[in-house]
């Protein structure tokens, strides 16, 4: 996961001029690993690119050097696994401007022809791009689904899982216990999935914590 503005310590800055580092990341993802970039991941103007992993991420920032490139990929894929639990337009906070997608990249959200969220397959691996992700219960679910999708872990979704993103499941398998936590000041209804995939419906009161045996 690489998060932050370009040319900062958070994303790496000039470190990305080191081919050993960029090659290692590409090799990791190409062989089946996952990559999540938020903001301007690997952002540093060098050798004609701003995002130094643009080929991996499938997204690049327009900084004036590619104005003459045709940019036809703007179709949104709103039914993607990552967006399945969203209840409203995704909150990207400040987001990022001038981001465009390469051909072969799936755009999940674009606004005024500026990419806000996209996914891309790179070899056997996958990457997720998000322009910004301020904390909220809904965005936390988006991040969780992004992690699962980028690591080919979609089948693991319904393990220690709450269908309502306002409610969390914490499993302490070695101790034989798990708890369900309502993070809100209102009662919530949800379906809880255990580690084996079995489930049960639950109504949980405001701020309530319920404990169960595994």
Label the predicted regions:
Residues 89-105:
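Active-site Gly/Thr loop motif
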Residues 4, 82, 96-99, 118:
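Compositionally biased, intrinsically disordered low-complexity segments enriched
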Residues 1-18, 133:
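The substrate-binding groove and active-site-proximal loops of carbohydrate-active enzymes
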Residues 26-29, 37, 52-67, 101-106, ...:
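Extracellular ligand-binding/catalytic regions of CAZymes and related secreted enzymes
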Residues 11-88:
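A glycine-rich, often tryptophan-bearing local segment used as a flexible ligand/cofactor-contacting loop or short
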Residues 9, 91, 127-130:
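Generic preference for well-ordered secondary structure
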Residues 6-7, 42-44, 136, 187:
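Glycine-rich nucleotide phosphate-binding loop and flanking beta-alpha elements
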